[in-house]
């Protein structure tokens, strides 16, 4: 989602956030990113990249991009060696897949966590059924 607040800033909201990338909130980690499906276009807009969670979810506070549009693919080229190990199910978000991109090829190296895995240990006491 792209939200423009005239005279203030432009927000780009992404599917992930604090649960799969806690480093910006915990350590002020800094990232670079680009619009992968339009990587050949010159940046002309400064945006704030925000995650899908309700608080403390600014991933990149200031990023120059080609004017973002809904449906664009935002690629963060590197997020750190321990990023996946630090991921959580905060707000009941499943963990995303991990994709290795090398020599022009992309391979899934960790599959996306299915919702069924998030709720498999949940129980409803018999007295409440």
Where are these regions (language model features)?
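Charged (often Lys/Glu-rich) extended helix/loop segments that serve as interaction or gating elements
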Residues: 1-129
């Amino acid at each position: 989602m792209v939200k423009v607040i005239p005279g203030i800033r432009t927000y780009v909201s992404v599917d992930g956030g604090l649960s799969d990338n806690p480093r910006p909130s915990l350590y002020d980690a800094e990232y670079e990113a680009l619009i992968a499906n339009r990587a050949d276009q010159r940046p002309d807009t400064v945006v704030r990249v925000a995650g899908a969670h309700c608080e403390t979810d600014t991933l990149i506070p200031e990023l120059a991009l080609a004017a973002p549009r809904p449906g664009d693919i935002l690629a963060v080229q590197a997020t750190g060696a321990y990023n996946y190990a630090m991921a959580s199910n905060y707000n009941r978000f499943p963990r995303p897949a991990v994709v290795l991109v090398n020599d022009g090829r992309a391979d899934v190296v960790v599959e996306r966590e299915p919702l069924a895995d998030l709720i498999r240990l949940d129980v409803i006491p018999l007295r409440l059924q």
